[in-house]
Amino acid sequence: MKIAVLSRNPRLYSTRRLVEAGTQRGHEMVVIDTLRAYMNIASHKPQIHYRGKPLEGFDAVIPRIGASVTFYGCAVLRQFEMMGVYPLNESVAIARSRDKLRSLQLLSRRGIGLPITGFAHSPDDIPDLIQMVNGAPLVIKVLEGTQGIGVVLCETTQAAESVIEAFMGLKQNIMVQEYIKEAGGADIRCFVVGDKVIASMKRQAKPGEFRSNLHRGGVASLIKITPEERITAIRAAKVMGLSVAGVDILRSNHGPLVMEVNSSPGLEGIEVTTGKNVAGMIIEHLEKNGGPNQTRTKGKG
């Protein structure tokens, strides 16, 4: 197969590993800088050009679209879909998962366990919003944040009110979530490919920190997940419409709670921690399921 990898940087671990794994399995791998691909949206022959030439003959595309280029990246991916190229994850699913609030609304509708989450616009509603999530301590998250940036733990009601007011004053969209104390600053990253959890790891926040993101100094270790956690991760990825996803789960007193469903999960942490060839499994999934016009939306965007 001829497979495009949409990535800003061919030197990134995840991009390198996907290219390696694909090449090892006999595929032609082409890394395309997402922001340098440009489109001709013609009615009969949609095209993508790259460095002055049209991109042609691709069987599949692997999007590694960073959060900051979601809008343009999804447009490029959608154009590939219009051309009948099979995407590892569809543009609609990626756009959906990048909107944290929309994701939680979709997951809650399907009855998937979530931390109690509040969202409000007016400062007048702050006291009731705080009560809604069972009061302090609570967590405040900027909707557009990634890698643990813009996530604040407020220990007291007073602190929570000040932080929420500050964010609202800056016109930042935020959500307020109950703090799951029993998780002890740890979460579980379940790596879903197709309808299986192919690898999972525990991420423990460093002492004095509650954010377990590896970018924030969290430490990863092996973990055996429960059947309930496995089912939750697979269902969450399915609800979002993602074939490949990193589902972050907290262990709470009332079962697994989904924190986030990531459409472009990094491979380094999970491969190094588990020793599994995750990149190879992703390519294998493409081989089994990919093909012209095989997208769930059948290439209609």
Curated annotation (Swiss-Prot):
Signal peptide positions (record): none
Binding residues for Mn(2+) 1: 248, 260
Keywords: ATP-binding, Ligase, Magnesium, Manganese, Metal-binding, Nucleotide-binding, Protein biosynthesis
Domain (ATP-grasp): residue spans on this chain: 104-287
Binding residue positions for ATP: 141, 178-179, 187, 211-213
Cofactor(s) named in the record: Mg(2+); Mn(2+)
Listed GO biological process terms: protein modification process; SOS response; translation
EC number, UniProt record: 6.3.2.-
Residues engaged in binding Mg(2+) 2: 260, 262
InterPro entries: ATP-grasp (IPR011761), ATP-grasp_RimK-type (IPR013651), ATP_grasp_subdomain_1 (IPR013815), RimK (IPR023533), Rimk_N (IPR041107), Rp_bS6_RimK/Lys_biosynth_LsyX (IPR004666)
An example Gene Ontology CC term for this record: cytoplasm
Cofactor note: Binds 2 magnesium or manganese ions per subunit.
Residues holding Mn(2+) 2: 260, 262
Enzyme class per UniProt: ligase
NCBIfam families (UniProt xref): PRK10446.1, rimK_fam
Family: Belongs to the RimK family.
Protein name (database record): Probable alpha-L-glutamate ligase
Species, as recorded: Pseudomonas putida (strain W619)
Gene: rimK
